[in-house]
Amino acid sequence: NFVDYPPTIHRIDLYAAPRTLDVVRKDFDYAFAQDKYRGVPEIELHEIDVTRPFSVKGVEILPVSGHHSERFAVTGFRIGRLAYLTDFKTIADAEVEKLTGLDVLVVNALRFAEHYSHFNVAEALELIARVSPREAYLTHMSHDIGLHAETEPTLPPHVHMAYDTLEIEIND
């Protein structure tokens, strides 16, 4: 059946390192075609240097580098007093220093058991202890982590399990 999609109303601005942009162009080539069909997302790519801060609509964003595995670099972001790190397995001390003074840290914690390319809960809690944010949220969790109602009470009081539709209020 033919679906008559409305024209794209909102453009998606995507900020990423050159390597990531190359993957996006390849995996979503239809979004960058000369003649797009209706309903295809309108994506505007913005190349960033992960070693330098950049600005989006007047808001400074500080890239935080880490590794997903030995050979695969990842980038998290600090925006004001919030930082978002996902797919991290390791982070250098110099990058951890970028996280001082946070109100909120969102960090991946795949499961309790060790994993080769993601922080487990113990590793995430270790990073949280080093950074000392006012609050921390665990994200990128697998089903192995257990039920929210059973697992969250085992965490330190300022550490929470994130969930879909969670909204975090940040006061500057």
Regions found by a protein language model. Name each.
Residues 1-85, 150-172:
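Binuclear metal-dependent hydrolase catalytic cores
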Residues 1-7, 90-98:
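Pre-active-site segment of Zn-dependent metallo-hydrolases
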Residues 51, 92-172:
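Binuclear metal-ion centers of metallo-dependent hydrolases, dominated by the metallo-beta-lactamase
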Residues 63-64, 85-87, 107, 138-139:
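Thr-Gly-centered strand-to-loop micro-motif
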